[in-house]
Amino acid sequence: MPVPEARSARRCGECHESYLTEWSGSAHAEADRSPVYRAMRAQAPDAAACDRCHAPLAAVIGRADPVTAEGVTCEVCHAIAEVTLGPHAASWTLQLAENRKYGPICDAVEPYFHRTGCSPLHAESPLCAACHHLEHVPAEGPAVPVFSEFAEWQHGETMPAGLHCQGCHMPQRRLAVASGGPIRDAVSEHGDGAATGDALRLTARALLGPEGLQISGHIEVSGAPHAVPVGLPGREILLGANLVSGTGEILSSAADIVYSRMLVDAHGEETPFFRALRVGSDTRLRPDEKRSFELWLPAAPPDAHVELRLLERALSPELALALAIELPAPRVLQVQRLTAPWGRAP
């Protein structure tokens, strides 16, 4: 039986240039080569199971074909003909043999290069559940949630009617789908879409108290139908504060508040999900939740200001150590500057 052919994203980009540009900078393009994934895969008991979502074409055409290193490439999502939801994971069917590309546009004219397939599924959340719905089932004990964003969307009470993953993560704009094609009013972006920082609202004030500056306020999730941070357990949102002098020198820092989900082993130590027995803690921010916080800094000189920073880190220090990789540098989501005159704490 002949092996189905898969085409590189670069070939698709000859007609779909804007899509190629957006996808090339996305997490989907990095799925098979991110340092965190490669370290996880090296320790996982079943590396082929990891490839199912990080290099899906490998299961169909074999790792020898270089196109598999493109991760979640064009040929993956647009060859999905069916997604089946299971209790612990979802499965999908890739249809490569006919060179038919599935998508939500149902009046497309077939070009010379490939056939087209009308697929309402491609505008709905179950498509994303193919990889964003996963529970680890240990040898003993209940299933451990790993990727739960689909389940949180599915069972959430804050989701606007009709909102699917694509509504935030693949926002629409006016564009020609292919070079020379008609301009359409609702064409989905193919980058990462909504970012973590877009879903978080931060309000704060600084008051002078007997122990120094009290930084207090609220952080809330706005518009997202799932908890934040999303994705791999061990991903962290960090909220911290620096006291900065008039010349820009950091005088002192408050310890970060960490929002994350941590999975643990039999000894209660944080561990990669494939060795986890249970959830050790879950301090993620819930949809439409408004959570208060408090940080303290020493009393400030007259010309100093407070820099409140909201960061995202791909992995906790404990998991980085367990995986023997360098701790990823945090990404800045938001920065707020609080300045004198300070109010008085009650």
Where are these regions (language model features)?
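Short, conserved sequence motifs used for protein processing/export or organelle targeting and
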Residues: 62, 136, 154-346
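Sequence context of c-type cytochrome heme-c attachment sites
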Residues: 1-123, 127-159
